[in-house]
Amino acid sequence: MRNYKKLEFSFGDNELVGQAQTRRRLNKIIKSDRISHAYLFSGPKGVGKKAFAMAFAELLNGVSNMTSLGEQKFSKKSSWFTHPDIHLFLPMPSSFKLNDLKERLELLKNDPYDIVDFSLRPSLSDDDSSKNLRAFYPIDYFRDEIKPAARLKPNEGEKTIIIISNIEQMRERSANAFLKLLEEPSDDLIFILTTDNQEALLPTIISRCQLIRMSPLKTPEIRDALIQKDGYEKEDAQYLARISGGNYSLTKFFDIENLKAIRDDVVSFLRVAYQLDTVQITDMAANWNKNQTREGQIAILNTMEVFIHDLLTYRETGNSRWITNFDQIEAIEKFVDNIPEARLTEMISTIHELRPNLQQYVQAKIIFTVLGIRFFYLMRDKDPEIAPDDNWKHIPAYISN
């Protein structure tokens, strides 16, 4: 049995972005030489859960790749991807095959922060060619692929390691079957699970795992990664990091020119919201619903939040130095002059409140319609007529237009 206490390393020093607290904790876990049979990495999308899970699996089986081990490595494999005892699974739409999964795993081999989730990136050849798909772990996927992998004895490494991304997407039968595996672990098997939505998991699954919480990445961390790892210019990296919402994976694939076009639409949306032009509000909401993928719709919300934050900053300081959209200073000045009493903080809170609904597949056209109508009141320093708990009452405004 490998004695991990003797290893000298800095977890993820070659590849991982931010998450200093999580890195320190994983360092301590491995150096303690008390390895649990199951770990659950929990946190928002795009903060590096899969990347950390892969780096953890590599380190446990002695692979020097994402973490530098030098002469201490005890595997000849170059990464988790080629190691026979490390198996990674993603939830899949029913229409996709295992070959589609292998393509995506190869992308992760080259970039652990690549977007490979079927739900976010249905097509690898053309990111805009299809809408978002729902992806799950149905019982046949679990029975035919995951369970047999978990029964394998280590071939080369210390442990057989099963990484299951987005474990919350297990169907009920799959989750119950998986729980049986989790309840009766073998000594040479480790599960590493990730989730974007811990609340959706069976409590019995959570209780049998060591929980590793991960936070949204900080703006400077994303900015530096975009410059150092992805080759962005400093100005573009700063802008992208500010609108990232702490999601590095999504941000690194943004098209800067497309984002600026989105920003122009956001400014127009705020103008028609101020006028309560319901026809324009619902038309824009329908257009975003139809022509933007889920990540594009999230980018719109992030862009909107940053622009409103710029309004707040400029109103309070009168200094353009501290704003993100500095090239939009004329538009910002006009907004601040025309809506001096706007409840900008409440507008940002409204976005925070509605963003999870978008991530849970509520139709974007409804969410943006609700935003437009509520913004009308908040920009006039008034209480919205429809309470936040009754957002469904905005739906007739959409249907009637």
Name what the model sees in each region.
Residues E58, L105, L179-L181, Q210-L211:
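Glycine-rich, phosphate-binding/catalytic loops in enzymes
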Residues Q169, E184, A200:
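Residues immediately C-terminal
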Residues R151, N176-I190:
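Conserved catalytic/switch belt of AAA+ P-loop NTPases
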Residues I161-S165, F178, L189-T195:
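Structural recognition of the conserved hydrophobic beta-strand(s) that form the central parallel beta-sheet
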Residues R2-R173:
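Clamp-loader machinery-focused feature within the broader ASCE/P-loop NTPase space
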Residues P148, K180, S207:
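Conserved adenine-binding aromatic site and its adjacent loop/helix in ATP-hydrolyzing domains
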Residues M1-W80, D187-I190, D196-T303, F307-N401:
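Charged, glycine-rich active-site and insertion segments that engage polyanionic ligands
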